[in-house]
Amino acid sequence: VKKYLLLPSLLLIFLFIQPAANAAVKKRYSPCKISYPSDALVEWDCYRLKRNETLEKLFGDRWQDVARFNRIDRRHAWPGMTLKVPRQLDDIKDFTPLPAVLPAAEQDEKFILVNLTEQFLGAYEQGRLVFSFPIATGDSKFVTPTGEFRVTAFSRNHVSSLYKIEKTRIPYPMHYALRFFISRKEVAFWIHGRDLPGYPASHGCVGLYDEEMQKKYYRNPDEPELMAARTLYEWAIGTTPDDGGLTRLKEGPRVLIIGESPI
């Protein structure tokens, strides 16, 4: 009799274990659920995306401004999520929450500022902002280190040695990667291309738009336009020879990381 009772007992154990495993899945957030100090500078409302709606369909040639303001890429603008939509789109034209002038970088030919609180990165030349992009960094669990660093290596075709693309065995692509820190546990931290879901979602690295990568691995979007990772990478390494692999950089740009994750 005990032999036949064993199977139902095992089944019950399995059913109770399953929810615990599912609970470990990383939580997703809509951009409307994330607060930034610069939100107060713009009047906006939450808008829930409907089926078949896209950033391009809703905002025409201003879709990139809305994407920047929400720190999101096109692939992650899903039906059901809520976006921050400015009442006046002109209020977010070329949106950036970063200072146009950074006195601490006046003596630097190239300088990178990462603001975790705002989830934005800026590139400076002699203390003047030349371009900026939204980012996805680590959250309170996978913390992005703060402080002063320097880009010491680069790798155009870099891939993760720890993480895979979801539901595949393909190493997660970290293209246009700039290494700025190696921890005492020998964990390397990079600025690189990745998905931008609209909230901090990395394992500690600093992620930038890379629609080239998304088209290659996810076949979406059809026409890549957001290529912040490539822009920063090419600016940072300048004329240094690049064979696509890991290359050390003797005097790379200084990197200053400030603030804390909004989640």
Sequence positions of predicted segments:
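Exported/periplasmic cell-wall-interacting domains
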Residues: 24-26, 75, 162-263
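Primarily a LysM-type cell-wall glycan-binding module
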Residues: 30-62
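Loop/turn positions that initiate beta-strands
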Residues: 79-83, 252
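Intrinsically disordered, low-complexity Ser/Thr-rich linker and spacer segments
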Residues: 32-39, 85-109
